Structure formats: structure tokens, C-alpha cells
Amino acid sequence: YDTPEDGQYVWANRKTMAKEIITSHDFDIFGVNECLLNQLNDLLELKQYEYIGTGRDDGKEAGEFCPILYKKERVELLYHGQFWYSETPDKPSKSWNSFCNRICTWGKFKDKKTDKYFFFFSSHFDHVSNEARVNSAKLLVQKVQEIAGDLPYFCTGDLNCDPDEEPISFILNSGLFKDSYSISETTPKGPAGTLHYWNFDFNPEHRIDYILVEKSIKVLSFETITDDARQGRFSSDHYPIMIKAEL
């Protein structure tokens, strides 16, 4: 977010580091959470990327985006959409005692290098209501089946719960997803947790950020990116996570 109350950690002091992480790791495609329109525009100064996504408050530009940014030279967008985590998912709304509207952005893409097709979903589950997180997990499973069908897919985001909690258990027990952290062919690099509370000396314990993959996808590596700690500059209050994968 771009929150004045963040003091020294306001977005104006973080945006350069955020863009440096993106360019240094050269992401082909990635999901973002807690992104306001002005922050999205700052990230789009990286001209190699295009985006899909809308604001959760009005389906246009208001409120948090969960955008998907993709490198246009590597990935072709075919079509896209979004849904809300609520009982009325086709319009801006909230249910299940959710603190606020929650949205999922999705797109169908083609990898220009391999000519393979895949879907990508970017979500942010509610941070207050466990009822909302459980029902959001159920809706995500339902929507992925409806939208992606038999094609490979990636689902990213801050799901605000640990791996042993009910929402993640439901998703993984559906048989439609694998947790990339658990199936990486190489040992995951960096801390398991991602939420560091603006503290370089804090060892994050809670793994609440995920890259969930369709079961046929091969995950070659998983990394929690700690460039912030190494350079002494924060880009976010979460460490980013990254995988290398083969379809």
C-alpha cells in the first residue's frame, strides 16, 4: 500500500527497491498484492511489462489491485477477467464477515518461447475473517476448475494463513493444486516465512504467501527473495517469493 502512516517506509521510499528486485530477478510473470493505482503506474515504468487487473472497490481503479504483470516479449495475453471472493463474485462485493472486498485477477497466457498455454491467478485473502478465508479457498478451487479446465495454472498471493490451516488444507486436498514450496526439485532458498514486519533481524515464521501450481507443473526451484535485508532497504513488509518452473 501507499500509506502515509508508514513513516520512513512510505511507498516513495520503497518503489525504487521494488523495481530493482523485479529487474534483477527478471520475472517473466508475477502477481502483486496491496497495489494501488499509483503504485501500479510506478511499476509500469518498467516498460518490458504489461498488466491486467482492476481495483477491488469498483472493478475499475478504486482500492487494492491484485494485478498480474507479464513480460510482453516472453508472454502473450489471450484473455483475462476477475472475480470477487464473495457470494456475488461477478461484482464488487464482500461476504462471510470479510473486512473488505477481496478480488482475484486471472488471465490466460501463451509462453512465446514454448508455445504452451497456461492460466495465472493473483489473489489476496481476507486478513480478519477465517470464515472468509475458508470460503475464499472453496471459491478459488471452483473458479479455477471453471476457468482453467485441463490447462496448467499458477495461483499466487497472500492467503493470510499458514499451510496447516483449513483454507490451505482444503485447496491442497482438492487434488487440483500442489504447493510449490513443498515440491521444489531443489531445497527452497531463504526463510520459509515472508512477513518480516519491517525488521531485518526478524526471522519470519509464518508462511502466508504462496505459489500454488497445477499438479503437472514441474517446480525446479523456490526462493524467498531477501534482497531487502542484504541491501538494507525495504521494498515491502513481505519478502517476495519466486519459482522457476516448467510446463
Describe the role of every protein-language-model region:
Residues K47, G63-F65, N101-T105, K116, ...:
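Residues that flank catalytic or metal-binding motifs in active/ligand-binding sites
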Residues I29-F119, E223-T224:
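Structured beta-strand-rich core segments of catalytic domains in phosphoester-bond hydrolases
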Residues Y1, L36-Q39, R56-K60, V75, ...:
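Solvent-exposed loop/turn segments at secondary-structure junctions
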Residues G7-Q8, F27-I29, F125-S129:
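Second-shell loop/turn segments in exported
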Residues E131, N135, Q145-Y153, C161-L247:
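Metal-dependent phosphoester-hydrolase catalytic domains
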Residues A18-N41, L69, G107, Y117-S123, ...:
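Active-site beta-strand/loop signature of hydrolases that rely on acidic residues for catalysis
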